[in-house]
Amino acid sequence: MKSTPAIRWISEVRGESARSEATAGVDSKRAGSLAGLGASAFPGSKTSDLGTGFGFVPADPGVSTIRADLGFRSLNDVDSSSDPQTGKIVSRWLGRFVLESGAILPDLVAAYRHDGVPIGDGRQILVVHALTGSADAAGDWWAPLIGPGQVLDTDKFGIICMNLLGSRYGTSGPISRNVVTGKPYGRAFPRVTVRDQARAQWRLLDALGIGKLALAVGGSLGGMVALEVALERPGEISRVVPIAAPSRIGQLAVGWDNIQLELIDRLGMDGLELARQLAITTYRSEIDFEQRFAGRVEADGTPSIVSYLHHQGRKLLERFDEDTYRTLVWAMDTHDIGRDRGGAVAALRRLAAYGTRLTGVGIEGDILYGTNQVREMIEAATAAGMDAAYREIHSTKGHDAFLVEWDQLTTILTEALK
């Protein structure tokens, strides 16, 4: 398979120097040739576009190790004093972290939630959130699946969910503050890839003493990261269940993402609102929209679908920011498990050698990552000799069905955990 074209990163910062925001260095050994990395992890971007830090200017000499504090939305976002076994979101400082690009985060911070069986006393399950999600899987977006007696049974398993690298809910990302400048990274935050996000998950798991996982599962971007978590440590995960996630990003999705990033670059937060509206149209299905909105108008004559999209756009503005959204979308567009591994089949042979099982879950009517893309991954896994199965969620909800179809998800995950 060909590597996926990446979105060109907009490295200029309007109104102030990117250098004033820079808080990280570049690891020359890991970076190697920027031109070589640009041809694989960042195809489609010129080396001159990427810069020595891929979207940021390195700190001045002598300031290569600067600790960054987090810029939380509120003090309640992360309770760093909480017991990690109590189900509260906690933060963990994980030290120096080198990205694929060679850029360095001097002090990676991870926010996570752990529920259920204590670490070290039983099997652990990793749940990975999607694009704008958080570590609060058990208390929020997957709550119907996690808990005593649920399919992800906290009486039998420990359930851990970490906020993704580059996000804004406690883990290092664009809103993290540099203690020297007192300002957030913003656009100067270095580019991250899905593999960087997977490696950050392992950094946290290692720090917590979790060496093996019974299951890694996630939807959309979370499914992509779950795949890379498995490939990063073949043999450490028994089963991987990526939901609505292919082996590589599809070109239609890259095109949609590019439009969103262009909107943000040109219009800032107004662009983010429009980007979210566009994204929502890819998360649902034609059937869902027709059933909910056909023939409906608001009191002022506005079509109800338009009012709905405006509402969704405004909702995201209340809890997100343009730099974080850009960082996460760009990371998603680097997804390709076959990159620098000889293709998808060769990559999946690494998992087959350790007996890792794979369940690829497609969603009926998903226009973002179609069922054909998930089937293609399972065909590659079968060719690689993996114990692989395809399952499908039947729904009118489109891509976001992995956030609402609880009964079908329960059936699929029950099978995966056998």
Describe these PLM feature segments.
Residues 2-13, 42, 51-124:
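Catalytic-loop region of hydrolases
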Residues 113-178:
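N-terminal cap/lid subdomain of alpha/beta-hydrolase-fold enzymes
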Residues 184, 188, 195-214:
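Conserved acidic catalytic loop of the alpha/beta-hydrolase fold
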Residues 212-248:
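Conserved hydrolase catalytic core segment
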Residues 236-315:
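Alpha/beta-hydrolase-fold enzymes
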Residues 360-362:
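Short beta-strand/loop motif that positions the catalytic acidic residue
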Residues 367-373:
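Conserved alpha/beta-hydrolase "acid-adjacent" motif
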Residues 384-418:
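Catalytic active-site module of serine/aspartate enzymes centered on a nucleophile-bearing elbow/loop
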